[in-house]
């Protein structure tokens, strides 16, 4: 056995799930103490799959009913994982405009690592209810926010349109509102799902396009307390070091956070550091018995 899957689980993700059992010709790869994968402590990050050089471990989405790989990509797109703010870089392998599988790419935030969401959480992109073209409300259709429109009723209330028509319609409507009361009738509220570049363009649209400073972002509310604490303690409300810097730290303090659940790739660096001798202190008013607390000294 090459043991790459064991090393990926232990040394990269620090999950310590995959190991070797028995001796001699009976030696084999096991999960925990020879438990079935589904009953083990495996978090399905897929690091072992990416590390496997032979195809002994492979994504189920590539196999047919007989367990034979029949799907091969026709192109690969370099992008970022959309699930959280860690910024993991990915290679998305595509065939006929359908995602086949995702691999971690060597970037400063993840060093080719991914979590279960980043590697396997892409089925929403092909959900039959996903809107694929712009829709415009049909003339005369009543507007009622209390009415829940099912997928089968969408064409009753909306019609398909081109991007040009939809953008022109939206721009005209926003312009009419802005012209009625310039500077005060329009406000922009940004989303945490947007990248920094998208957030910059959004505020630029509000400030320059509609000539108003009525722009805000949801993270100002949820991170106001942490920013204030950072300003007082470090004289900076922004991040001062990447997660990977944990590898060089002697002591790491995690306060009120659950990185193993919410930012699993970031948590790998904390777990790596703890296994290499760093002091990991976890403070959480909700309490933690699993996750990052398993690796904490206090």
Annotate each PLM feature.
Residues 1-298:
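N-terminal export/assembly segments and adjacent metallocofactor-ligating motifs
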């Amino acid at each position: 056995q090459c043991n790459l899957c064991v090393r990926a689980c232990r040394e990269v993700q620090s999950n310590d799930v995959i190991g070797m059992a028995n001796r001699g010709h009976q030696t084999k790869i096991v999960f925990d103490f020879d438990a079935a994968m589904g009953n083990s402590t495996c978090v399905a990050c897929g690091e072992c799959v990416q590390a496997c050089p032979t195809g002994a471990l492979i994504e189920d989405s590539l196999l047919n009913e007989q367990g034979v790989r029949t799907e091969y990509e026709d192109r690969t797109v370099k992008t970022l994982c959309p699930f959280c703010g860690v910024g993991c870089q990915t290679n998305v392998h595509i065939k006929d405009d359908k995602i086949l599988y995702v691999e971690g790419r060597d970037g400063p935030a993840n060093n080719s690592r991914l979590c279960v969401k980043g590697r396997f959480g892409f089925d929403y992109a092909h959900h039959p209810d996903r809107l694929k073209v712009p829709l415009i409300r049909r003339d005369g259709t009543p507007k009622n926010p209390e009415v829940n429109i099912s997928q089968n009723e969408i064409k009753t209330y909306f019609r398909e349109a081109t991007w040009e028509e939809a953008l022109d319609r939206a721009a005209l409507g926003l312009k009419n509102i802005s012209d009625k009361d310039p500077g005060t009738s329009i406000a922009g509220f940004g989303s945490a799902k947007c990248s920094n570049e998208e957030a910059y363009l959004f505020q630029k649209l509000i400030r320059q396009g509609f000539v108003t400073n009525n722009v805000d972002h949801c993270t100002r509310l949820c991170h106001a307390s942490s920013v204030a604490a950072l300003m007082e303690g470090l004289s900076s409300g922004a991040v001062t070091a990447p997660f990977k810097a944990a590898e060089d730290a002697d002591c790491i303090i995690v306060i009120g956070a659950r990185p193993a659940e919410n930012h699993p790739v970031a948590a790998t660096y904390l777990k790596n550091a703890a296994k290499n001798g760093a002091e990991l202190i976890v403070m959480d008013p909700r309490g933690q018995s699993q996750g990052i607390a398993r690796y904490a000294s206090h």
